Amino acid sequence: MTSRLFALIPCAGTGSRSGAAMPKQYRTVAGRDMLHYSLAAFDACSEFAQTLVVIAPDDAHFDGRRFGGLRFAVRRSGGASRQASVLNGLHALAEFGARDDDWVLVHDAARPGITPALIRTLIGALKDDPVGGIMALPVADTLKRIDATSSDGRIARTEARDGLWQAQTPQMFRIGMLREAILRAQADGHDLTDEASAIEWLGHAPKLVQGSLRNFKVTYPEDFDLAEAILSRPAAAS
């Protein structure tokens, strides 16, 4: 049987660094909730069997009516960390018939610049890969490591950027492998910040697929203006 595709959007974070009065995934950007753009991108890819959004059990901001017409399901099973929310989401996908050998694409709700074209680029590059992989960009800036003993932000040294890539999402792995990887990381006392880290912890080497600058993560207050500018352009609908 052909492996199917599922999308998982962990959406239980508070977005404390964004300075917003509500979780940043619900803040309005270019006329819509930030979460809408990710849902719309996956909805435009008819090859997905289901898109699942995992929100916090006590989330009072989510309103499904704001995403009318888009295909997705919601589960209030968010955990205390991203890793916990993703694991709970993987368990929930079984309700929709997901099998261990099916693919899951995990995507940050705070990356509204994702497009159907980027999603399909990732799928095309990884559908026959034995491990899976992630969207990423080569590091372009010079990297400085701060002196941990300095109280005023002094540079300790410059880090070589050769071979360094900045991880993005979606991150695409087999459901069974990713679940096993997260459970192993948890058992070893690690709370990892992305899915690729868990797969690496299991001893595998995920593949990097070049992404796009537009698919950046909205993190700080000034990022909202950049997201607004990108998403207001006609290309954002492609």
Curated annotation (Swiss-Prot):
**Coiled-coil ranges from the UniProt annotation:** none
The protein's superkingdom reads Bacteria
Query: Which organism was this protein described from?
Result: Paraburkholderia phytofirmans (strain DSM 17436 / LMG 22146 / PsJN) (Burkholderia phytofirmans)
EC numbers on record: 2.7.7.60
Listed Pfam families: IspD
- Outline what the protein does: Catalyzes the formation of 4-diphosphocytidyl-2-C-methyl-D-erythritol from CTP and 2-C-methyl-D-erythritol 4-phosphate (MEP).
Q: What is this protein called?
A: 2-C-methyl-D-erythritol 4-phosphate cytidylyltransferase
What Gene3D superfamilies does the record tag this protein with?
A: Spore Coat Polysaccharide Biosynthesis Protein SpsA, Chain A
Q: Which reaction equation describes what this protein catalyses?
A: 2-C-methyl-D-erythritol 4-phosphate + CTP + H(+) = 4-CDP-2-C-methyl-D-erythritol + diphosphate
Q: Tell me which HAMAP family the record gives.
A: IspD
Q: Which GO molecular function annotations are given, in alphabetical order?
A: 2-C-methyl-D-erythritol 4-phosphate cytidylyltransferase activity
Identify the metabolic or biological route this protein is part of.
Answer: Isoprenoid biosynthesis; isopentenyl diphosphate biosynthesis via DXP pathway; isopentenyl diphosphate from 1-deoxy-D-xylulose 5-phosphate: step 2/6
Q: Which family does it belong to?
A: Belongs to the IspD/TarI cytidylyltransferase family. IspD subfamily.
* SUPFAM superfamilies registered for this protein in UniProt: Nucleotide-diphospho-sugar transferases
Instruction: Write down the PROSITE patterns for this protein, in alphabetical order.
Output: ISPD
- GO BP, one annotated term: isopentenyl diphosphate biosynthetic process, methylerythritol 4-phosphate pathway
Spell out the InterPro entries in the cross-references: IspD, IspD/TarI, IspD/TarI_cytidylyltransf_bact, ISPD_synthase_CS, Nucleotide-diphossugar_trans
Site feature: Positions MEP for the nucleophilic attack: 161, 217
Check the record and name the PANTHER family matching this protein: 2-C-METHYL-D-ERYTHRITOL 4-PHOSPHATE CYTIDYLYLTRANSFERASE, CHLOROPLASTIC
Which residues are marked as site: Transition state stabilizer?
17, 24
Which UniProt keywords are given for this protein, alphabetically ordered? Isoprene biosynthesis, Nucleotidyltransferase, Transferase
Q: Which NCBIfam families match?
A: ispD
